[in-house]
Amino acid sequence: MSVKLGPAGVPLSCKGRTIVEGMDDIISLGLETMEVQTVRLVSPQHFEQYWQAGVLANKTNFEMNLHGPYYSELLGDKLQRNRSLAKVEAALQTAKTINARHITLHVGHYAETGRGHEANEQVASVFNGIVQRINDIWNDDDEMYPVFPWLSEGTPSKIGIETSGRQELWGSLEEVLEVVNHVEGTIPVLNLAHIHARGHGRLRTSEDYGELFDQVRETIGTKEFYCHFSGVEHRMGNAMHYTQIKKSDLNFEPLAEFIIEEGSWLDMTLISDSPLLEHDAMYMLQNIEKARHKQLERKAREERRKALAAQTSMSTEELQAREAEIAAARAKDALANMEKKVEEKAPAEEPKPKAKETKKQDEKDSNDDLFEVDEDDDDLF
């Protein structure tokens, strides 16, 4: 099992804002990957820092990834499609410069084609062209190898097709899997917040995640997964906006449990899309470690039961039931002791002392009566 975690962009805690400085911070946190955001437009002046990041990634075996233009209309009319493909071209060139292993792309609205086989065929045709283009860029010029050594040592970036989070956008899980299954060189980008929202909150247990990953594996026969994770606010099958993980009904603990208990076959890159970026990436890493410790504790208990069963006439099931009885009895005793301590600590109610009346106080009261007038409290304000 291999799980790499990282943020979508330069960490919030990074003092510098360049990609290389962001990589340094990510590595120092114990994370292993990042996704560079080029969701709107790639400017030529950025290519120097992109190349520096690519060199560093190549030397340190750090996994770089790239998110292409957010606003795409690959199912639109000819003008819309050409504009979108021009942005994609810039992203592909950046991916080469930065040594990106995965490029995440969006499709956009269904447009006039609507849902169905025709739309999927058109998307497949577009992505066939994109895959061919990244291969051409990667093998463009042998003389470039000294500058980009990863071109000769590695393979072209994989083109990722992201699941969408809204009903009017192409990109349901089934649509993405159908296209990926027919276009070599593409992979599904499983945005788990989008899948959860589009499925009206479908990802709640480790079994739900197991069904999802099994569906992908059975459909396209892959063990490699590129995923986005974040909290999400959703309504009526549509993602409204990302939230931090702890403030969402999309919990990470069930996914961590699935990864540790059932995901030994996974090769996963997990990107934090949360507004907290690296903080939630670290939160995910901590939850995976907790799940791993729970698994080790469970296995240790099972081994202990087997050893006891071999020494006694009891079966492992009987020993487990006995352990449950002892644990329940201890919990009951602990609750009783706690209630007893609370009762002992409760202070007895002390009688209130009677006020002493003095001659001076009587005189003061009589003086107050001289100036007493009836007033409504509301009139004071």
Where do the PLM segments sit?
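C-terminal helical cap(s) of enzyme catalytic domains, especially alpha/beta-barrels
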Residues: 278-297
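Gly/Pro-rich active-site loop or hairpin
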Residues: 16, 75, 114-117, 170-173, ...
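Charged helix-capping and loop-helix junction motifs
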Residues: 47-52, 81-88, 119-125, 173-176, ...
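Acidic (Asp/Glu)-rich catalytic clusters
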Residues: 23-30, 45-65, 90-99, 131-137, ...
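Hydrophobic faces of well-ordered beta-strands that scaffold small-molecule active sites
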Residues: 3-9, 34-36, 64-68, 103-105, ...
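N-terminal pre-domain/capping segments
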Residues: 1-93, 187, 294-337, 341-344, ...
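Active-site acidic/histidine proton-transfer and metal-coordination neighborhood
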Residues: 74-189
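Active-site beta-loop-alpha junctions enriched in small/polar residues
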Residues: 8-12, 37-41, 69-71, 108-110, ...
